[in-house]
Every structure is written in structure tokens, then in C-alpha cells.
């Protein structure tokens, strides 16, 4: 697996995309249920049922995907188990 270092500006862009993903998760559950999504600049730029498929699509269309938030949008209900 390839490891990439992000400079400050690109890391901030990545953080903004992750923040947007978290803030909009409920909307994404309705619009992109059970899909992997790529977020850039406050919008979904691609989605796919498989992570491999999404990454292949992104690499075809973009030269640098390091700032994208790439996450899975699950509709499964999370339960907290306290022991």
C-alpha cells in the first residue's frame, strides 16, 4: 500500500472534506445509501458500491486524490454496547 505525505494546505483540504462528510452524514444516508463516496469541496464527486471501484474511477478522472474524503455511508443502525 502506498503512503503519501500531505502538506499543510492539502491536509487542511482533507480535514474540511471529512468535516463536511460528518456534518452531512444523515443526508448522505438518504442520497447515497450503502455506498462508498468521495467528497471534495463540499460535494460528492463520485460514489460506488465497492472501494476498489471508487478508487479506480477517481484515479481515471483525477491526478491527485489525496485531499478527497473517501468514506462508506452505512444505513445500518449503530448500537452502543456498554459492559
Residues covered by each model-derived region:
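Short, compositionally biased leader-like segments
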Residues: 1-18, 23
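Short, mixed-charge low-complexity intrinsically disordered segments
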Residues: 70-83
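Amphipathic alpha-helical interface surfaces
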Residues: 17, 24, 50-54
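Short aromatic-glycine-(Arg/Gly/Cys) micro-motifs in beta-strand/loop hairpins
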Residues: 21-41
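Residue-level recognition of the N-termini of beta-strands and the immediately preceding loop/turn
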Residues: 36, 66-68
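A short, exposed loop/beta-hairpin motif centered on an aromatic-Gly-Thr core
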Residues: 42-49
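A short, charged, amphipathic alpha-helix used as a generic interaction element across diverse proteins
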Residues: 49-64
Amino acid at each position: 500500500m502506498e503512503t503519501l505525505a500531505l502538506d499543510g494546505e492539502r491536509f487542511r483540504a482533507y480535514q474540511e472534506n471529512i468535516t463536511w462528510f460528518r456534518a452531512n452524514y444523515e443526508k448522505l444516508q438518504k442520497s447515497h445509501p450503502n455506498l462508498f463516496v468521495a467528497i471534495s469541496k463540499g460535494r460528492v464527486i463520485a460514489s460506488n458500491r465497492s472501494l476498489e471501484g471508487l478508487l479506480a474511477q477517481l484515479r481515471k478522472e483525477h491526478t491527485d486524490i489525496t485531499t478527497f474524503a473517501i468514506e462508506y455511508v452505512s444505513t445500518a443502525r449503530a448500537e452502543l454496547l456498554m459492559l
